[in-house]
A protein has these predicted regions:
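Hydrophobic alpha-helical segments of membrane proteins, primarily the transmembrane helices
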Residues: 18, 22, 59, 63, ...
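Juxtamembrane helix-break-helix junctions at the cytosolic face
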Residues: 66-93
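Juxtamembrane loop-transmembrane helix junctions in multi-pass integral membrane proteins
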Residues: 5-15, 49-56, 76-86, 109-116
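Cytosolic juxtamembrane helix and N-cap/initiation of the first transmembrane helix
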Residues: 1-28
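Hydrophobic transmembrane helix segments
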Residues: 23-64
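Membrane-helix boundary connector in multi-pass membrane proteins
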Residues: 97-118
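Membrane-water interface at the C-terminal end of transmembrane alpha helices
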Residues: 123-147
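Hydrophobic alpha-helical membrane segments
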Residues: 85-104, 123-125
Length: 152
């Protein structure tokens, strides 16, 4: 019975880490949408017409960057090794740091509300997600996984 309880607790911890990274990814998407709307609004206010500010490459970049945020959430769910959890921690932390740094830079250029949105929507959930990933990484034995054949 104890093994079953340990297995369920480890599974719950992995799911909690994945959920926290998804909350952080959602916050990043909200921040990016607010930043884009603010940028377009400033372009319209300054010139009276909306120029084509985003080309096809910029839109692809936005889609790819928003899609990369799913990787830190998926790794703890599908992998049983600590290397995957470490990769989730490192990639997620890197994404949080770069998004917040970009948000602070854009906040200096476009207004304080952009920086505040980056801090509230990305940094705050990112700290909790990184902390949960670190705790999961420090667990002495984490045998639970959702896919038994995973070799990551």
């Amino acid at each position: 019975m104890t093994d079953l309880m340990n297995e369920l607790a480890a599974r719950l911890d992995r799911q909690k880490v994945a959920l926290l990274w998804l909350v952080c990814a959602t916050g990043n998407t909200i921040y990016a949408a607010i930043q884009i709307f603010t940028f377009v609004n400033r372009q319209i206010d300054s010139s009276g017409a909306a120029p084509a500010a985003f080309d096809a490459m910029a839109l692809w970049y936005f889609g790819i960057v928003c899609s990369i945020w799913i990787i830190p959430a998926l790794l703890p769910l599908v992998a049983r090794r600590r290397a995957a959890i470490l990769c989730s921690f490192l990639l997620g932390s890197f994404l949080v740091v770069t998004s917040v740094a970009g948000g602070l830079f854009d906040g200096m250029r476009d207004g304080f509300h952009i920086a505040a949105t980056a801090i509230l929507a990305v940094a705050l959930p990112g700290v909790y997600a990184a902390r949960a990933s670190w705790r999961l990484l420090r667990v002495a034995e984490a045998p639970a996984n959702l896919v038994n054949a995973s070799d990551i």
